[in-house]
Design a protein with these regions (language model features):
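FIC/Doc superfamily catalytic core
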Residues: 1-177
Length: 177
């Protein structure tokens, strides 16, 4: 998928189609990349089902989607602050940066409260759009949701895929894609 290609996956669109439709893996491609694509596809399927139901955003919903995104590629991390499992959607208990020596994201201790705030903010705007649909406002909400979630960076891995998934979730919910 394009979302995993941004993350560095070398699996092409045609190879993904064969993987999704026929269960045929791409010769010479890393298994982790193929698993990443299968997991993301399942996350999109769950997300679209919830979008059709107009399910309210919650931290548990986000963690559940993250668990699907990271199901086969996540890991257990043991840190001084505790243990967490990215394949279960657990929030990070460590600091993270954008690449080696890159920008630091917010302190992990702030993440739970920021995610609650994020969900309340998104739900308030979603509810307004459900009452008075406006395609421009729906697009803006989806872009804002992507930007806010990737800025919070709640997980140790999969933040980009999750942020794009949530952006697409909102676009799907409001009939834009």
């Amino acid at each position: 998928t394009h979302s995993t290609a941004i993350e560095g996956s070398t699996v092409t669109e045609i190879e993904n189609q064969l993987l999704f439709d026929e269960g045929i893996t791409a010769k010479g491609k890393p298994m982790v990349e193929q698993l990443m694509n299968l997991d993301l596809k399942q996350a999109y399927e769950q997300s679209m089902a919830w979008a059709n139901e107009h399910k309210a955003f919650s931290v548990e919903m986000l963690k559940s989607l993250s668990a699907i995104v990271m199901r086969n590629t996540g890991s257990v991390y043991s840190t001084l602050t505790g243990e967490f499992d990215s394949s279960k959607g657990d929030l990070r208990l460590v600091g993270v940066t954008a690449g080696a020596g890159g920008r630091s994201y917010m302190n992990y201790l702030k993440v739970p409260a920021k995610l609650e705030e994020f969900c309340k903010h998104i739900n308030k705007r979603r509810e307004a759009l459900l009452k008075n649909p406006d395609p421009t406002d729906a697009y803006l909400l989806s872009f804002d949701a992507h930007n806010i979630l990737v800025t919070i960076h709640p997980w140790v891995d999969g933040n980009g895929r999750m942020s794009r998934l949530i952006m697409n979730h909102i676009q799907f919910e409001f009939g834009l894609v």
